From Swiss-Prot:
The gene is pyrF. It comes from Bacillus pumilus (strain SAFR-032). Catalyzes the decarboxylation of orotidine 5'-monophosphate (OMP) to uridine 5'-monophosphate (UMP). This is Orotidine 5'-phosphate decarboxylase. Its EC number is 4.1.1.23. Substrate binds at residues 10, 32, 59-68, 122, 184, 193, 213-214. Keywords: Decarboxylase, Lyase, Pyrimidine biosynthesis.
Length: 234
């Protein structure tokens, strides 16, 4: 069986996030806690989710000097989450430091969380790269390069769009995790994300794991939407 779809809990408070999850009681879930929710609630929300037997992707996208990132990862390692991330743009030294901090901070006898690197945000377009960031390479070239750096740094995978997943597996390793946000059911709004795809297309492209937010959290019947996505994905 593939990894479960990750539900992005993009809510401003723990109360709203936990209320949203009530209809899912008894359903095995993998959820994502991002900056908004974690900065509001802190580790308390993680404990509440673990009580519901949720697996957790703590999506904080660390990006700072290596020493700071290492110390931060050392602290995150004790929180008992399953997946964490950094920005690949921080470079190899920073990514290696993140991994070291995670390994040294993971309590004895426990598996360390998987760690992945963000390549290019799904809101990024090639036009933006050229006009604002002065990057002349193609978007796919930069994603593959960031992926190679993450792999060389010992990380478990990357965050990318569905459209780069196959190329990453071909250039790096079929076992390298590709975790892809920007997943929508057909006819759903894309909002601020530019590089989006359906669960079925993600499956075709060999994606390791999908992250789904609004197609579930904004659905009239979230549990039904989740099972529709699960059916397409499996």
């Amino acid at each position: 069986m593939k990894h479960l779809p990750i539900i992005a809990l993009d809510f401003p408070s723990g109360q709203e996030a936990l209320a949203f999850l009530e209809p899912f009681e008894g359903t095995p879930l993998f959820v994502k806690v991002g900056m908004e929710l974690f900065y509001q609630e802190g580790p308390v929300i993680l404990e509440a989710l673990k009580e519901k037997n949720c697996r957790i992707f703590l999506d904080l996208k660390l990006h700072d000097i290596p020493t700071t990132v290492k110390k931060a990862m050392n602290r995150l390692a004790v929180l008992g989450v399953d997946l964490v991330n950094v920005h690949a743009a921080g470079g190899k030294q920073m990514m290696q430091a993140a991994l070291e901090g995670l390994e040294s901070g993971t309590p004895a006898g426990q598996k360390r969380p998987d760690i992945i690197a963000v390549t290019q945000l799904t809101s990024t377009s090639e036009d933006m790269m050229r006009s604002e960031l002065l990057i002349d390479r193609s978007l796919q070239e930069t994603v593959i390069r960031y992926g190679q750096l993450a792999y060389e740094s010992g990380l478990d995978g990357v965050v990318c769009s569905v459209h780069e997943s196959k190329a990453l597996h071909e250039h790096i390793s079929p076992d390298f995790l590709t975790v892809t946000p920007g997943i929508r059911l057909l006819n759903d709004q894309t909002d601020d994300q530019k590089r989006v795809a359906t669960p079925a297309y993600a499956k075709e492209q060999g994606v390791s794991q999908i992250v789904v937010g609004r197609s579930i959290t904004k659905a009239d019947k979230p549990l039904e939407a989740y099972h529709q996505i699960l059916k397409e994905w499996e």
